[in-house]
């Protein structure tokens, strides 16, 4: 009888993942693509329901992922080297969870095999976001949805 092999995210640290493994950790929730506001007094990060102009509001996927940094220069590309700084990511984010020594949730596509689970479980904001072109930046505070960290 063959020994059970643990999934890669349980066997490897973030800095040991290959590019395909790293990308597969993304659950497709799109929350990292929401506009965020930082409290200047305590550094808290607040998520708004206002999405980056490249984010598809229904699928929660970037419409130009490969070239996103050309269109949105301040788009943050997550890397394993930044793992210690992932507190600003949503508490459900696989990158943050693994960086904090936690496991993936049961609804994560790598665990359940269903990429739609993140939407069915309402982890994503699919259908509940606004495009940044629809809201003046001065009004973003009116659209806060949660605090990270």
Swiss-Prot record:
InterPro entries: Puta_zinc/iron-chelating_dom, UCP006173. It comes from the Bacteria. It holds the Pfam family CxxCxxCC. Belongs to the UPF0260 family. PANTHER family: UPF0260 PROTEIN YCGN (PTHR37421:SF1). NCBIfam families: PRK05170.1-5, PRK05170.1-6, PRK05170.2-5. This is UPF0260 protein Avin_32930. It comes from Azotobacter vinelandii (strain DJ / ATCC BAA-1303).
């Amino acid at each position: 009888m063959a020994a059970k092999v643990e999934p890669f995210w349980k066997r490897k640290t973030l800095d040991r993942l290959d590019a395909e493994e790293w990308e597969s950790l993304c659950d497709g929730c799109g929350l990292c693509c929401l506009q965020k506001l930082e409290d200047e007094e305590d550094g808290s990060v607040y998520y708004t329901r206002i999405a980056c102009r490249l984010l598809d509001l229904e699928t929660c996927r970037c419409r130009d992922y490969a070239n996103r940094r050309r269109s949105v220069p301040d788009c943050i590309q997550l890397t394993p080297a930044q793992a210690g700084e992932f507190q600003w990511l949503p508490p459900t984010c696989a990158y943050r969870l693994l960086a904090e020594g936690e496991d993936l949730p049961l609804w994560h596509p790598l665990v359940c095999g269903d990429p739609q689970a993140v939407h069915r479980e309402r982890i994503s904001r699919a259908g509940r976001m606004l495009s940044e072109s629809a809201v003046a930046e001065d009004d973003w505070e009116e659209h806060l949805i949660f605090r990270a960290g």
